[in-house]
Every structure is written in structure tokens, then in C-alpha cells.
């Protein structure tokens, strides 16, 4: 929390997203990033609609403007609990839009890179799994597949690692617009 507070201070006057306020540190991060320096606060919860909503409520009760909150409702790489993460995202979007729940109407950002590059398909070396092909290409594939799927499922933004993944997803978004 202290590092995030210092980061918010360092980018004072700029439009920055400070990741991540969690249940255990939302007061410090929310106060520094959202209140003192008027930054956007990333609210990170486990893959659970109720926890996401609760954190948004806590941040807004602290005084952070709801328009300055971006939710991270959790993620998983494609094939690794991904369906549960997507169903949570679907429920968040349904409650926000269909039911008009203002506490869930914040944009969603999904940190794809940390999930996609941490699975065995991306981590196994070519020496260990030669039949799987090039390790870097596998990581890129996992990142692109997961990013495309979460964007289709309601995420408003993704965090990617590899330049090829960024280019591929950027192209996909431009072609869909």
C-alpha cells in the first residue's frame, strides 16, 4: 500500500490507474490514489461478484468517486478456471446493466499476462516438451486467446505482456470497431 501511495504521488497531475486496492489495503490506496491525487483506483477482488461489489462500496464510502474506480474481478488463463472467471464477469455486467446496480457499473480491467504466462503450456521449455513447439509462441497464443475471450466476455481493458500479443489484440479491437 505504501508503494502504491508513492506511485500515486509520483504521477500527480497525470491520468493514471493505480493497481490495486484490495480489501486489506483499500483505505490507504483509495485515500492516496483516489482522494489525495485524484487518480483512478483499480479495485481488485477475488473471482466473486459479491466481493467486487463490496470493495466498490467500501471505496465509494471512503470518498472515492465511482467514476474513478476500475474493477479487476479476477482472471484465469483459458482452460484454467477461465469459465468461472467469465461467469463472474457476466454476472457483474448483467447486474450493472440489466439490473441498474450502480455499485457494479465501473469498467473492468483484466490482468491477462500474469495468468497466461504462468500456465504449463507457456512455461514448459522446448527441451521438456518438444512436441508442443516454440515456447514463446505458446505463451503468446495463451495470452491472445485469454485476452480475446475476456474482452468478448465484458472486460473493457486487458493487461498484456508480449509486444506480439499487444499488436494482435490491438488489431482485433480496431477491426471490430
Listing of model-derived features with the role each one plays in the protein:
Residues 1-12:
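N-terminal active-site wall of soluble small-molecule enzyme domains
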Residues 11, 96, 173:
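Active-site catalytic pocket residues across diverse enzymes, especially alpha/beta-hydrolases
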Residues 13-14, 65:
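Short, well-ordered coil loops that connect the C-terminus of an alpha-helix to the N-terminus
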Residues 14-20, 40-43:
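Short hydrophobic/aromatic-enriched beta-strand-loop microsegments
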Residues 24-165, 169:
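Catalytic alpha/beta core domains of metabolic enzymes, predominantly
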Residues 169, 173-177:
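Short acidic, glycine/proline-enriched helix-loop-strand junctions
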